[in-house]
Curated annotation (Swiss-Prot):
GO cellular component terms attached to this protein's record: cytosolic small ribosomal subunit
Transmembrane regions listed in the UniProt entry: none
Domain of life: Bacteria
Protein name as annotated: Small ribosomal subunit protein bS18
Lineage: Bacteria, Pseudomonadati, Pseudomonadota, Gammaproteobacteria, Alteromonadales
Keywords (A to Z) from UniProt: Ribonucleoprotein, Ribosomal protein, RNA-binding, rRNA-binding
Known partners and oligomeric status: Part of the 30S ribosomal subunit. Forms a tight heterodimer with protein bS6.
One MF term in the entry's GO annotations: small ribosomal subunit rRNA binding
Protein's GO biological process: translation
Gene that this polypeptide is encoded by: rpsR
């Protein structure tokens, strides 16, 4: 039987040495929200607690300024 190895999750922001996550960096923020607009939890992405808080704050600011949608299309 073949054994499947799960890739080890790591925090991209820690690896790159990011000081602060910017709410204007929409390309990065879009990687951390689902198609429906929800914030992806850190247990899925592997983001550390410090950067998960910054990420949530940045996404909420971007939503408030209409840079990101709150939800997907309302149909």
């Amino acid at each position: 039987m073949a054994r499947y190895f799960r890739r080890r999750k790591f925090c991209r922001f820690t690896a790159e040495g990011v000081a602060e996550i910017d709410y204007k960096d929409i390309a990065t923020l879009k990687n951390y929200i689902t198609e429906s607009g929800k914030i992806v939890p850190s247990r899925i992405t592997g983001t550390s607690a410090k950067y998960q808080r910054q990420l949530a704050r940045a996404i909420k600011r971007a939503r408030y300024l209409s840079l990101l949608p709150y939800t997907d299309l309302h149909q």
